[in-house]
């Protein structure tokens, strides 16, 4: 941060001799501040619902740093009501800093990641349910935005189409018209499946690939010149950022040229500094897909706006490509991790369940 911010001078630090929690450090989630944030969110939910009566439940995943994503279960009494709710929440206090809002049905648990993936797969038509708001207020701490305090926002409507909506399979009201909508989006048929995952893995730029749902693919790739997670980067490297952009474009086009390309509505791309098949991979993936992603820079649509590419690779600082300095990740040494893991008090406790994965990682 280079602006005029308060400065705190620490003159002394005291702690218990055998402190269980010797420090508070914000870094790669889950961290203790995440659960404090969730507790605060629950306390203020009744106030939020009083002002926004359409809201059934709201969840700000700690994996996304709270300000990057909100999953909102919203009532649907009339067409497009969930979108109205999302727009209202973007004006609710510090929720104005949100990068993305996903609205789901009122009976859906917004903490259930499996249900969220199902909704994205079955209830989102890219052309009509993905809404970009340009030039909005951003969080000062969001390093991915090209301008301080300004970025584009994203609303994803993953709710069931109500019967009175012109996109439903019901007959329109007299004097009105129906809006052409795929039958799978109306909920009366299943969509075709993307079947070229093995061909994707053979693409030179792909390190690994994993299908999250029939129409949702995530791939990892190696980017040369990526800022080190330990040090970040304050040095502009225009050539490296240009190469990163070209690599993502090449990778996107290679995948979108496969035979079952029209069945792949969601394509997520991120760095290969994570194992897509490791334990709790999706928690790490949720963090990377939101913290490294800028809507204006990383969201791409095909010509017919039927497919979406979500570039969540780490941007490289560049003055010609509008990438600001990139911060380091708060990491811990192996010695510290081993010491904490061996602490006798920790054997008595487990991290509380935050996201529900239906028994899977």
Where are the regions a protein language model picked out?
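Charged, compositionally biased interaction regions
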Residues: 1-361
